[in-house]
Swiss-Prot record:
The lineage of its organism: Bacteria, Pseudomonadati, Pseudomonadota, Gammaproteobacteria, Enterobacterales. Keywords: ATP-binding, Cell inner membrane, Cell membrane, Ion transport, Membrane, Nucleotide-binding, Potassium, Potassium transport, Transmembrane, Transmembrane helix, Transport. InterPro entries: KdpC. This is Potassium-transporting ATPase KdpC subunit. It comes from Shigella flexneri serotype 5b (strain 8401). GO terms for cellular component: plasma membrane.
Length: 190
């Protein structure tokens, strides 16, 4: 019985620290230092939430830039089912999926002159990626220009405006957020 009291008091102390103090402290610091990120990096138009800057959306129309394929099968870009496809590079099923995606992209983008960018046919590790390279966005310009009756120049400028450079110049590559880019594309029509 004498060993029960120190064990119980240690348990209660650690429960208070790890279950109360630490979560409250990290939440408060997150809200203070990074309020936008701590609240989900939500993209708002007025009072309406249009998406998150961290999670891709399933844009499928010809008038939109398409992002990386989602690995969340039943409902694309479902954050509750996040995860990669887990198919190895040597798996024939992955080859079939990529071939089908290439064929679909070629059919939807007949005016594209170069090879299909790799990130448009391969899912990210999370299956929710919202970024593609500016080159992958530019590859889609002819389709979008035709669907929205916009000039190639307008779309090129839009991609340049929404492209983000890596934090460190030689580590990483420039990316463009598909959700933000497509929302800006919708504003061009207004």
């Amino acid at each position: 019985m004498s060993g029960l009291r120190p064990a119980l008091s240690t348990f209660l102390f650690l429960l208070l620290i790890t279950g109360g103090v630490y979560p409250l402290l990290t939440t408060a610091l997150g809200q203070w230092w990074y309020p936008w990120q701590a609240n989900g990096s939500l993209i708002r138009e007025g009072d309406t939430v249009r998406g998150s800057a961290l999670i891709g959306q399933n844009f499928t129309g010809n008038g939109y830039f398409h992002g990386r394929p989602s690995a969340t099968a039943e409902m694309p870009y479902n954050p509750q089912a996040s995860g990669g496809s887990n198919l190895a590079v040597s798996n024939p099923e992955l080859d079939k999926q990529i071939a089908a995606r290439v064929a679909a992209l070629r059919a939807a983008n007949p005016d594209a002159s170069t090879n299909v960018p790799v990130e448009l046919v391969t899912a990210s590790a999370s299956g929710l990626d919202n970024n593609i390279t500016p080159q992958a966005a530019a590859w889609q310009i002819p389709r979008i220009a035709k669907a929205r009756n916009l000039s190639v120049e307008q779309l090129t400028q839009l991609i340049a405006k929404y492209s983000q450079q890596p934090l460190v110049k030689y580590i990483g590559q420039p990316v463009v957020n598909i959700v933000e880019l497509n929302l800006a594309l919708d504003k061009l029509d207004e």
